[in-house]
């Protein structure tokens, strides 16, 4: 395998300094300290305490955890790599989250809290009845967690450590998994959220330092556009334009038919996929469900949205600068050159961020950036482990063992994390053999093929009282068949390298995966609507407090029994959140317009 045979070609010759080792040691010590502190203060001896932090979490750790959970090492490496390869447009994946995060807190969370659920499949069972949809969603979420989220973060983190330090791939990955699992098992969601808050601070500080040094290398932001346009490798493929940076690299909105990230797909298709991730995926929603009241959930979403503005300047633009500074490595197009630079023939854009770290960061700060990547990896993995444990315990094990007590459920929840560790370690050889240039595309393709049907049943379930179990199930099945067919075709007919004729079937060649997400969403909605109208309507208990139109009115101010706030104080903070949300959207629109 290319990744194995050339792995030593790009291992750094320099050794870690004592200062670097001290910085990394301090980082791990802080993690252990925060983990022990939060584990000791957390109520982890009940199901609600372990899986939902006792529903007593404040807004600031929720917001930090929402951000940290979504910014794993896969996004650090992937966003910088996509920026190096194609420019700014990939920032849309981050900025689109603003509107969906607000929808989570203002629309979805009131429904979820009023329904008194622990997992999202549990809500679907209450809303539609029956067990088959809940089981399907739980299994689907577990599969997506293991084979997309964990795999991408592990690969990207291991790639970074290998390039920067030359550490053994297996040893560093297993050590990271062990540390992550230790404090996740010990303290539950509260520990995960508080350590995520620490990771967020470390990630932002380290990324800011590297971004400032990168911009200084090229003379500031004003020089980026001209410098990026000239970032051409010395060796190119004759009679092709593969080596040329995109002409629309500095623009967010790209042509619907010829753009690599068409504006239609980034506006509508991405919103469908983002709604699944931010509003219906257990990993994310679990943080908002832990809020002490709805106002804290709203404030957490607002904080996370502001933080999601940062990756443009902290990851994507530094990735573009990396191509400017190292065009022969980051921008390589000749397979033999790419093999030399990073061990992958298809391209080396994914080494953009670690390359910057190794070339620009001095002794000490290099250790800080290694800690940053470890922070990104740990925060993402802890989130996935805790949420996957919750899904299996509450949606699968409790159905197999209805008489299971709280002690048994807590034990099973901890054992599931151990099993996930084993599966993750077993997946490492597959990751090493995978093409590093395709990981980010692989993740998005899988999401576009499997997520839209889930988004559809949640949207219709919340906003359409007539939707029932028959319609939801057959809508899901129709979406699964069509989405799985697309996935199979993508694996059978991979996208050809630049410079080769595209002979893939027309549905793959002509239909962008973001546009496919739109079509799949509409298909699922149509089948679900038809199935619901052709079968009996849902019972009253399946819509009471379970749809937007049947929600109890006291949830409009974020009331929660026992939160210790007067109605006047709740109303005041609700208005503060509303004003902040409007201001946030104005800031987001300004940035979109500026980089349009």
Swiss-Prot record:
Residues with the Phosphoserine modification: 48, 141, 145
Originating gene: Slc5a10
Glycosylated position list: 4, 96
Chief subcellular location: membrane
PANTHER family: SODIUM_MANNOSE COTRANSPORTER SLC5A10, SOLUTE CARRIER FAMILY 5
Subcellular location field: Apical cell membrane
Function, in words: Electrogenic Na+-coupled sugar symporter that actively transports D-mannose or D-fructose at the plasma membrane, with a Na+ to sugar coupling ratio of 1:1. Transporter activity is driven by a transmembrane Na+ electrochemical gradient set by the Na+/K+ pump. Exclusively recognizes sugar substrates having a pyranose ring with an axial hydroxyl group on carbon 2. Has likely evolved to enable renal reabsorption of D-mannose, an important constituent of oligosaccharide chains of glycoproteins.
Membrane topology classification: Multi-pass membrane protein
GO CC entries: apical plasma membrane
UniProt keyword rRNA processing, yes or no: no
Protein name: Sodium/mannose cotransporter SLC5A10
Cytoplasmic side: 37-72, 121-149, 195-200, 286-300, 377-409, 465-471, 535-575
UniProt keyword annotation of Lyase present: no
Catalytic activity of the protein: D-mannose(out) + Na(+)(out) = D-mannose(in) + Na(+)(in); D-fructopyranose(out) + Na(+)(out) = D-fructopyranose(in) + Na(+)(in)
Family label: Belongs to the sodium:solute symporter (SSF) (TC 2.A.21) family.
Tissue expression notes: Predominantly expressed at high levels in kidney. Very low expression is detected in testes.
Source organism, top-level taxon: Eukaryota
Consequence of gene disruption: Mice are born at the expected Mendelian rate and have no apparent morphological abnormalities. In response to long-term fructose consumption, they develop exacerbated hepatic steatosis associated with massive urinary fructose excretion and increased hepatic triglyceride levels.
Any Pfam family: SSF
GO terms, molecular function: fructose:sodium symporter activity; mannose:sodium symporter activity
Modified residues (Phosphothreonine): 148
Bilayer-spanning residue ranges: 16-36, 73-93, 100-120, 150-170, 174-194, 201-221, 265-285, 301-321, 356-376, 410-430, 444-464, 472-492, 514-534, 576-596
Alphabetical UniProt keywords: Cell membrane, Glycoprotein, Ion transport, Membrane, Phosphoprotein, Sodium, Sodium transport, Sugar transport, Transmembrane, Transmembrane helix, Transport
